[in-house]
């Protein structure tokens, strides 16, 4: 990706406006999951080390534009950064200019409260741009949205660059999708083929093998002519599944774990894939399938993982995802994982340090995998050329 990188710039004495992703869950004024803040701290430290006058902003939740409410405030993020030892303050009225002292971080209040943010109003983009000498886009999770703080500001700022987080994300995705070391294996889980159809189509042109899981696998099992009982599947997409299976190596499970109801207490029965009864639902792959797929992963050189292979939230239907997770963790392949359920599985099985790259962007990750252009990246590339 040909973008200017923040790491390559001289920022001494420069006013630097960082668009981060600090959209963290907050309860009773306290941050309840700090992963996104922790991921942003190295970028803030780097800007300070380079002698920049640092401003950082983000969206938080879904406020109504033009109406500020206390629950939409980034104050809990400011409190967190203070506790982490930063000299930091919150600025609510910043569109007409901000005074930033050396060594301090000024957090600019929730961008989504500003009128015109979501529809990328150029006048708002110009106001953001006027605050800085250098704009740093470091929020991969919002890179698929053209908004005033992700796109407009990059259009008008004197210099627009990618922050370390965004640059690392683009490098990792490029490594997995543009020129992957082979064999390249993709794991695509989820409840519906329809929501991952573009992902499957795009990966069918790149991957040597695609492992499908969850409700998606059920549609492929039905397409192979097996009874899926009361399982979640999409009958109308069986022709699509057949076409994908004809043109791509998509192994269908040979055995499955079934239950009579979708509940944590439902008993799990393992059976051969062609023996599912009408009153049963498939909630996981069986041991034999999991071991076969683990072997495929073991021999891979690149693994892209998006989605579990079973209802791993329920202990009885967790084993398939657990075996696959550990196969990825123990593999020598370059592995990249993304998507909320995938990250939850990584946390559950304690393998975060064994995945080469964990993507922070849900929707943006999927759109990149689909081969779509991410507007916030596109404008950085355009600015790098000028």
Swiss-Prot record:
UniProt-annotated location(s): Cytoplasm
Entry's Gene Ontology cellular component terms: cytosol
Cited InterPro entries: Phosphoglycerate_kinase, Phosphoglycerate_kinase_CS, Phosphoglycerate_kinase_N, Phosphoglycerate_kinase_sf
Chemical reaction(s) catalysed: (2R)-3-phosphoglycerate + ATP = (2R)-3-phospho-glyceroyl phosphate + ADP
UniProt xrefs under SUPFAM superfamilies: Phosphoglycerate kinase (SSF53748)
Record keyword Nucleotide-binding present: yes
Pfam families, sorted: PGK
GO MF, any single term: ADP binding
Pathway note: Carbohydrate degradation; glycolysis; pyruvate from D-glyceraldehyde 3-phosphate: step 2/5
Family to which this protein belongs: Belongs to the phosphoglycerate kinase family.
Quaternary structure and partners: Monomer.
Protein name, per record: Phosphoglycerate kinase
Lineage: Bacteria, Pseudomonadati, Pseudomonadota, Gammaproteobacteria, Pasteurellales
Gene: pgk
